[in-house]
Amino acid sequence: TIILTIILAFTGMCLRPPLMIPFVLAKSQPIPGTTLDSDNAWNDRFRAIRWDNDSDRWLLSTSEGFISVNEDFTGRPVKIPSSTTPPVSPMGITVFEKTTPGQWLIGSFSGLYNWNPATDKITDYYSGQPYSPAGKGRPLSAHLISGYSGDFNSQEPVVFDYYKGAENMPEMPDILRDQPMSLWNFALELHVGRAYEPIIGPFSELFVFLSGLTLLIILISGLVIHNRHHRRQKQHKIITNKK
């Protein structure tokens, strides 16, 4: 039972940063016989698809990057070089919208960018500055974009930030502001550690990792002490029987 609990604690730690990041970036072969073991080339790679009127082709967002395909998918898919496309977080694309002719808005936890596939021009949505790769590091931006909508009755589109919430939204009505949080949402906030952010600040992101590490130390040290105590008792019985 304790071995199973150790496995559960460690695998749970891998579902949140920092252990999650190397697992997300790493690639491995699927386990034979599982749902990921498929002959379909798009299986677990396809993320989103949009029709591009300017090029009369489909634009696809995949785990391998952006791909261009002709209208009826009879031609060979063409992978667009990553150096000419906006960065997309391993967590997946969250905004894939055409704003004006030739212009696309691409968003993810790696930021929000304006992209012109024809000219390969990429600019930051907030600063307007040209995008330049930052190199290897944490695959997250200062703006963790979780959604976008241009359907609200407002002058500016509404961008949803993971931490800041919705931008350019009208003030929340009192009837909604005073609504209590559901028990499910409250339990989720406790589970991932976000509920502790007012207390421990940015360390709340490490809550799952630190609590899992503490649990592992307790379990492993307890297992070691238990085994030592068991061996001593066994040796004591052997000595007693010999006497």
Question: Where are the model-predicted features located?
Answer:
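Repeated scaffold domains used in trafficking and secretory/extracellular systems
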Residues: D37-W51, T84-P101, Q129-F152
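Beta-propeller fold detector
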Residues: R76-S82, T123-Y131, P180
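Internal alpha-helical transmembrane segments
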Residues: T1-P30, G193-K242
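Hydrophobic/aromatic beta-strand positions that recur at structurally equivalent sites within the blades
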Residues: I67-E71, N114-A118, H226
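Extended, hydrophilic extramembrane loops/domains of integral membrane proteins
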Residues: Q103-I106, Y113, F152-V192
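Residue-level signature of beta-propeller blades and closely related beta-rich strand-turn architectures
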Residues: E64, F109-S110
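Membrane-interface segments at or immediately adjacent to transmembrane helices
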Residues: I21-K79
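Short coil turn/linker residues within repeat-based beta-strand modules
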Residues: F73-G75, T119-K121, P173
